[in-house]
A protein has these predicted regions:
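Positively charged, polyanion-binding regions of nucleic-acid-associated proteins
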Residues: 1-35, 48-51
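Eukaryote-specific, cytoplasm-facing alpha-helical/coiled-coil scaffolding segments in long proteins
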Residues: 26-36, 58, 119-128
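Short helix-coil junctions and helix-kink-helix linkers
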Residues: 30-40, 73-87
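Histidine/lysine/aspartate-rich catalytic loop segments that bind and position anionic ligands
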Residues: 41-67
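Short, amphipathic alpha-helical interaction segments positioned at domain boundaries
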Residues: 68-81, 120-146
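Short amphipathic alpha-helical interaction segments
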Residues: 84-101
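A short, conserved structural fragment
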Residues: 96-112
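Minor-groove-contacting beta-hairpin "wing" of winged helix-turn-helix DNA-binding domains
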Residues: 112-119
Length: 146
């Protein structure tokens, strides 16, 4: 979910280029993940109250926001600079370090800054951001796409 959120923030899939920003701060990504998990959980609960069972009607297209939200919120919030895997900051940082090792982003730990690489830009531009795939990603994140 963290990776999906990162991708949606960097690439909006509209206009002559799909890339919508040059960098993202780690703290901003962490806040966006929390906000999107809360929004997805609220949508999931709303659908359950309306009698729409997400897991039987749309099982393949839906993320389990309840479990993800519980797991993410169970992580501690720590002071700036903490990199323990048991904190939200550390968890998001570990994911960014993984993406950095894969050559998909440049993660500058000192500045807590995330930038995409040409490798990720090309993958997103030519493989992921066709209309069908972008709409599925946005739907999974609880966003509407037109």
């Amino acid at each position: 979910f963290v990776i999906l959120t990162l991708l949606v923030e960097f690439y909006d899939g509209q206009g002559s280029t799909s890339k919508s920003r040059e960098f993202l701060k780690l703290g901003e990504l962490q806040n966006l993940v929390s906000e999107r998990l809360k929004a997805g959980l609220a949508l999931e609960q709303e659908r359950e109250q309306d009698g729409t069972n997400l897991y039987t009607e749309m099982y393949e297209n839906v993320l389990d926001y309840k479990s993800m939200s519980e797991a993410y919120e169970s992580l501690k919030s720590a002071e700036t600079g903490s990199r323990s895997k048991y904190t939200k900051e550390g968890y998001v940082s570990i994911i960014c370090e993984f993406l950095d090792r894969q050559g998909l982003i440049v993660f500058v730990r000192e500045d807590e800054m995330i930038k995409t690489t040409a490798k990720l830009d090309n993958v997103m531009e030519y493989k992921i951001l066709n209309k069908e795939n972008y709409a599925r990603i946005m739907e999974a994140l609880g966003e509407t796409y037109e």
